[in-house]
Amino acid sequence: MMWWSLNLWTVFQILSNIYAGAKRWDNVAAVRKKMKRKRVRKEPGLSWVENQGRVHSFVVGDDAHEDMKLIRGMLEWLNLRSKRAGYTPNHEVILLDVDEDEKSRLLWLHSERIALALPFALLRTPPGSPIRIIKNLRICTDCHVALKLASKLVCREIVMRDINRFHHFRDGICSCNDYW
């Protein structure tokens, strides 16, 4: 049954993404309603980061961490510094019927960005030490761009393992050469 559920989830997700890409929001809502009725759930994006011997996990939009105030402050700082350095958000990866400002905000709530902010926000990692993040799904194109830029802005290597491969972000460049 698990194999069937996984494949059914994949079919529904692809269909929903196709409709969202075409901005057919009524069809997206119908697919999601059908998923709910059939109890087919989307796998949430999760990211893990180790900090001072403790593993922290985050989901998209997570606000449950004890240091979330510091993390949000660091995310805002990274967002502002990134914009000054030329970052422009790729709204196409947000497949929701919301305005552009909301899409920009939602991008900064992806689990890998929250995980990235934790070591900086807590100021507990030695300067120059790498940050290692694990993600259960493929990193989206916008987060890939943001992490490349973040590695340059904060002068740190960021090592991320997503479902496909390792990404080593250093000085604004990724080891995957932007192919993943």
Briefly describe each language-model feature range.
Residues 1-180:
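Terminal (and in a subset, N-terminal) low-complexity or junction segments at the ends
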